[in-house]
């Protein structure tokens, strides 16, 4: 059955500012030493005071359905293991850190013992230092080798922004160590003329799983000197590796371990995770290795005031008689505006790239009515920007030039934002783990912080803001991934065979599902068995068989038609719904109209315009069951698990009037369907059961959709 997913109006009437303009801004302290003077904590607004001012306008107080106060926590120090080089300890002390927290010292001890370890503590608890200190100490030891690279380390980040930020931190921390530590980023933004230097001379390489999958492992002979000296693999923000993406990354790591063994190395894995359920179990599933867990957070924490915020009603009887609330997008933009006027450094998290752009634009427009000098202190931050734009935003955020930022989850991860006073979360992000990760971005210097969850106008968000115990009294979720998924495993077996012929001894590394998948790959003539090994048979690159993030295809370049200027990129899957012909595209406060989308050449041509409407794509999704592997009774129905094919197609787009959200018209689109074969869970019911539940055919689709949301 196919369903149409119609996002609610994303832009509506904007209420006037409800706070008195504040002419001073509050400087923020960095996590470590800063060139800027550190402010007196007493001069910073308390979280309660900030929330009080946000709620001081007419009807504002009634929008707060609950306020949770998390008390401050004192820290517990320890000493570094005596095997850490004194030069490294001195470098850490130069950054203003005299003693480690107990969990940092414990993690370093495990790393030096050769135990793979996962540090699963709260945001801003110093996880980076826990793995950096043993890594730097080992690199310093290795610098005595004749080639100066007797030890190397590989850092994996889920985003380019986090890798670039970590590279800055490593350079700052290791500066007193001279050239013994040579960190370098190796990703899609790295100029080609720099790549050879990284391969030959860098001993701390920061990259992402995508580059490891497509760039490093297929070219492993060019990385031989690096790989044979590889002592540590650091996997930052490992809780983000879940679902299909996490399953792909798990297989990429198995390929890495296999290639390392070919060069005689067996690296220790150091993982950093947000607070999660059973982090050691998830880390073992990800790496395929036994992993020690360090989860007792001994760092100090400032007070956190967490408010649940429900936007006001705009209509008592909207579509189909249901009441309608003001959109979370508009409400979040108001709060970001108010916080900026107060001089409170803030980030507003939103799920979509378009939402981040909208919140930024709305906030800038409202700030222009109060103080035009504040307009340039608010911006959007999302994926798809050009590297130079992204780096400039990160510099401005790091320096304090930006007061307010509307960001996607690209900033949810551990990029050092030098401490924030407040975080506004536009709609429940889907998991409690992600909610706490976003909320934890505030107060990173140990000071008090404010977090506000703004509810979207949907049943789940409404339930959560009126049942705070569902958020505050329940543990975070486990990280779920399935490396044995045959649709994930198959392309990685091909990639592994292309890197090095695949032997029987390798199959244990890749898991028991190999026995079923390998014959299928042989039948498809992708692999051929010769003597005692399987070989890749095609001319094309095996690593190109799969996109580990599930997007597929080449990134689509967004180009200004009149000038030929490249504005940014979007992955092919998202291009269908965001840069189709006729779409309104937002980029750093400017509005563009998409004139054409060429999927063959991966180019969307746009021109600057100011249409009086926004656009929303409509799509259909159909799921076909290919094979049922497991089926068990589940109440009156059946619960099933097996292989499915998912087909999605963008079929049209709506034009909605700005401010009111009124639908002006619908335009059909002729875009190709996209299919994905994967594994799924589904339940089945009979017509008799539907009749007993009094569900008639007209509401069946909506009922199933509601059941889907309830189950996840």
Task: Identify what each model region corresponds to.
Residues 39-64, 352, 588-597, 601-603:
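Structured, non-catalytic alpha/beta "coupling" segments that mediate domain-domain communication
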């Amino acid at each position: 059955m196919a369903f149409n997913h119609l996002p609610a109006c994303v832009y509506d009437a904007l209420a006037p500012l409800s706070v008195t303009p504040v002419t001073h801004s509050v400087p923020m302290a960095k996590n470590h030493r800063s060139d800027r003077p550190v402010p007196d904590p007493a001069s910073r607004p308390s979280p309660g005071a900030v929330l009080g001012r946000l709620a001081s306008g007419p009807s504002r107080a009634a929008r707060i359905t609950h306020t949770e106060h998390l008390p401050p926590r004192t820290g517990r120090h320890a000493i570094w293991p005596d095997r850490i080089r004194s030069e490294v300890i001195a470098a850490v002390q130069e950054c203003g850190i005299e003693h480690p927290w107990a969990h940092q010292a414990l993690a370093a001890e495990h790393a030096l013992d050769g135990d793979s370890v996962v540090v699963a503590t709260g945001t801003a608890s110093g996880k980076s230092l826990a793995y950096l200190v043993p890594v730097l100490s080992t690199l310093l030891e290795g610098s005595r080798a004749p080639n100066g690279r007797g030890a190397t380390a590989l850092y994996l980040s889920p985003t380019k922004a986090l890798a670039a930020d970590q590279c800055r931190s490593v350079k700052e921390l290791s500066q007193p160590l001279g050239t013994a530590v040579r960190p370098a980023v190796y990703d899609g933004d790295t100029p080609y003329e720099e790549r050879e230097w990284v391969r030959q001379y860098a001993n701390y390489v920061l990259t992402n799983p995508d580059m490891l999958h497509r760039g490093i492992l297929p070219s492993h002979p060019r990385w031989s000197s690096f790989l044979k000296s590889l002592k540590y693999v650091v996997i930052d923000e490992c809780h983000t590796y879940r679902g299909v993406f996490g399953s792909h990354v798990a297989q990429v790591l198995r390929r890495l371990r296999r290639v390392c063994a070919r060069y005689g190395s067996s690296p220790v894995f150091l993982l950093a995770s947000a607070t999660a359920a059973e982090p050691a179990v998830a880390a073992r599933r990800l790496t395929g290795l036994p992993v020690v867990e360090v989860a007792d957070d001994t760092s100090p924490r400032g007070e956190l005031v967490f408010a649940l915020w429900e936007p006001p009603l705009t209509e008592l009887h909207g579509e189909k008689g249901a009441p309608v609330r003001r959109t979370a997008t508009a409400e979040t933009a108001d709060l970001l505006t108010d916080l900026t006027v107060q001089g409170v450094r803030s980030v507003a998290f939103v799920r979509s790239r378009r939402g981040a752009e909208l919140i930024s634009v709305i906030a800038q427009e409202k700030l222009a009515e109060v103080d035009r000098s504040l307009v340039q202190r608010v911006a959007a931050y999302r994926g798809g920007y050009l590297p130079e734009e992204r780096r400039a935003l990160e510099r401005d955020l790091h320096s304090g030039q930006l007061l307010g930022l509307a960001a996607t989850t690209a900033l949810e991860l551990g990029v050092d934002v030098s401490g924030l006073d407040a975080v506004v979360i536009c709609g429940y992000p889907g998991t409690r783990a992600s909610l706490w990760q976003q909320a934890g971005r505030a107060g990173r210097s140990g000071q008090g912080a404010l977090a506000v969850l703004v509810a979207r106008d949907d049943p789940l968000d409404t339930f959560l803001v009126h049942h705070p115990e569902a958020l505050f009294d329940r543990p975070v979720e486990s990280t779920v991934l399935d490396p044995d998924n045959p649709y994930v495993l198959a392309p990685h077996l091909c990639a592994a065979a292309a890197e090095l012929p695949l032997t029987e001894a390798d199959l244990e590394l890749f898991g028991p599902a190999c026995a079923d998948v390998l014959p299928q790959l042989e039948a498809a003539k992708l692999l051929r068995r010769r003597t005692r090994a399987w070989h890749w048979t095609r001319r094309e690159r095996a690593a190109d068989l799969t996109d580990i993030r599930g997007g597929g295809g080449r990134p689509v370049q967004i180009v200004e038609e009149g000038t030929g200027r490249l504005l940014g990129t979007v992955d092919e899957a998202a291009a269908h719904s965001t840069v189709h012909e006729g779409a309104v595209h937002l980029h750093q406060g400017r509005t563009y109209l998409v004139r054409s989308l060429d999927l063959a050449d991966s180019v969307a041509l746009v021109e600057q315009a100011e249409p009086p409407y926004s656009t929303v794509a409509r799509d259909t999704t159909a799921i076909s069951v290919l094979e049922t592997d497991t089926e068990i009774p589940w109440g009156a129905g059946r619960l099933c698990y097996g292989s499915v094919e998912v087909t999605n197609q963008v079929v049209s787009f709506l034009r909605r009037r700005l401010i009111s959200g009124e639908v002006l018209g619908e335009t059909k689109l002729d875009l190709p369907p996209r299919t994905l074969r994967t594994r799924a869970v589904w339940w089945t019911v009979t017509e008799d059961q539907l009749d007993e539940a009094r569900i008639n055919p007209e509401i069946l689709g909506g009922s199933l959709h509601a059941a889907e949301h309830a189950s996840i």
